[in-house]
């Protein structure tokens, strides 16, 4: 599975759509399979994010005795991952994200980095290379 360019906890800017220009923290990242082949394998997958305070939708919920009251609740709706841009924690600008692999001795580390300021954002993975 490929590493995600946007993760839970990142601050993002909405760059397209009705909510354009709004910022928020990513609460959840998930994928939705849109189409499968004859064997049942996913062919077309879209990735979505839930951003705090952005794309608020109203849901009508039934009451559940002892759990919740019924009525209309307001919750965040999904936004396609292509419509948001990460805000770099170093330079505080919306940026594209790249991946950088750094080898130090027998350890290979993969970092997400900001393409504007060229600084590492965080560590994605770390592997120990077997000596040869």
Curated annotation (Swiss-Prot):
Keywords of this entry: Ribonucleoprotein, Ribosomal protein, RNA-binding, rRNA-binding
Keyword Ribosomal protein part of the UniProt annotation: yes
GO CC aspect terms: cytosolic large ribosomal subunit
One BP annotation, GO: translation
UniProt-listed InterPro entries: KOW, Rib_uL2_dom2, Ribosomal_uL24, Ribosomal_uL24_CS, Ribosomal_uL24_KOW, Translation_prot_SH3-like_sf
Molecular function GO labels: rRNA binding; structural constituent of ribosome
Its biological purpose: One of two assembly initiator proteins, it binds directly to the 5'-end of the 23S rRNA, where it nucleates assembly of the 50S subunit.
Assembly information from the UniProt record: Part of the 50S ribosomal subunit.
Alphabetical list of NCBIfam families matching this protein: rplX_bact
Similarity-based family: Belongs to the universal ribosomal protein uL24 family.
Name of the protein this chain belongs to: Large ribosomal subunit protein uL24
Gene symbol of the encoding locus: rplX
């Amino acid at each position: 599975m490929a590493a995600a360019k946007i993760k839970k906890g990142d601050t993002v800017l909405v760059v397209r759509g009705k909510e354009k220009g709004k910022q928020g923290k990513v609460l959840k990242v998930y994928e939705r399979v849109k189409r499968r082949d004859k064997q049942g394998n996913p062919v077309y997958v879209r990735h979505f994010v839930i951003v705090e305070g952005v794309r608020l939708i109203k849901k009508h919920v039934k009451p559940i005795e002892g759990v919740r009251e019924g009525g209309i609740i307001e919750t965040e709706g999904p936004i396609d991952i292509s419509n948001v841009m990460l805000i770099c924690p170093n330079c505080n600008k919306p940026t594209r994200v790249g991946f950088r692999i750094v080898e130090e001795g027998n350890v290979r580390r993969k970092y997400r980095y900001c393409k504007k300021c060229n600084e590492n954002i965080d560590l994605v993975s770390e592997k120990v290379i077997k000596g040869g």
